Amino acid sequence: MFELPKLVKALELSIKSHPALLTKFSFDEDGEIVQTYDPSLMSEITVEKISEFDLNILKDNLVQPFKMIDSRLFRCRVFETEKSAYMFFDVHHTVFDGTSFKVLMKDIAQSYMGMPVPQDYYYLTLKKRENAAHTAFYEESRKYFEERYDGDDWISFPPVDHKTRENEFGQLACEMGVTSAELGIIEKRFKVSRNEFFITVAALAVSFFEGKPKVKLSWIYNGREDLKMMNTVGLLYRDLPVAFCFDKNQNIADIFADVHEQVQKAIEHSCYPYVENNSLVVEGDVASVLYQRDIRDAGDLDGMKIETVDIRQNNAASQSVLDIEILDSDLGLRLSLDYASSRYERSTMERFRELFLRITAVLVHADGAEYLTVKGLRDELQKNHSFFRKVMSVFSKRKRN
């Protein structure tokens, strides 16, 4: 039987175990923003009894903007209805990332079952990163990135419909027509990781969409360099660059080999924040690619399956011009395009989404895809609209079954 008081205690212990969640931002004497650990930010979590009807109304007003200075940057509430128990957790991205969610959920489950929560090394990690900035390797990494990726003739996202500094949020999400098992075959065929595969698909889509060969994107590396950091909650991921200069006679397999090398070198030199130092809103935006396990697959708690409930984000802002997220789950893969709706018409993003899906479908399902050139891939896309529709139709039937 599920014990709600026991869950509340597990929640409180897990939150207290992660310093990033009890961190606040403030200004120092020089007017610089600093972050400080403040355990007094933790408040007691209580069980709130409410009806399913009232909770259904309340849930879409739970997510609201945070006060950023001298304030707690997470919210946690527990609700009990006549039907279920619900945990609401909202946290600002400045102290939390996708890996952090997995760590927190694992710790809640372990604490609920009476197991100890591993040590969190958040502030030690920040100190190590500060110290790294004063090393010779940091300077070597800066030179590596600048020599490899500097220049102003790259395209880094599909052409926008409107030029503005307004930052409204839009999203398109859909099933991809690809299973995790099929991706396993792709990894062996092209000798790339799933992350590298989708980075390449994204770059090809941007290039074909605008008709230009030189593309520079960023991709998300979780930033956890050792086992200790794998238990650490915080905004620790790194945005790393990757670039392409497509030629019509270039073999797709050779492109994948180059991407694999770039990804490995970028991780090696990830102590230098090249993308963060060079990306400016509007003038220096770079589309970002993220492949990850779908965080909505929350797993179970002491043998009881956890279900996630989507709720509305109020006053949401776009984090970048375009985030291309591929979410992998047991049910298949989902594509999510998070974009600046103040700069893109929805119809533009719908056309880009279809192109991304078609490139994926050809590379995954077409016979001899590993022998295609860039021109051959483009030809397949132009003549094979029916193939794409057939693949998506078959996948939809498979999902229903």
Enumerate the predicted regions with their spans.
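Flexible, non-catalytic linker and terminal segments flanking ANL/adenylate-forming cores
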Residues: 37, 264, 292-299, 346-401
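AMP-binding/adenylate-forming domain of the ANL superfamily
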Residues: 53-58, 101-102, 139, 167-185, ...
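Short amphipathic alpha-helices and their capping loops
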Residues: 8-53, 72, 121-170, 384-401
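His-Asp-centered acyl/peptidyl-transfer active-site segments
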Residues: 1, 8, 19-21, 27, ...
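Extended, hydrophobic beta-loop-alpha segments that form or line the acyl/peptidyl-thioester binding
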Residues: 18, 22, 105-106, 213-220, ...
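Acyl/amide activation-and-transfer machinery of modular secondary-metabolite enzymes
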Residues: 1, 28-50, 61, 70-75, ...
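Active-site-proximal acidic secondary-structure segment that organizes catalysis
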Residues: 79-123, 349-364
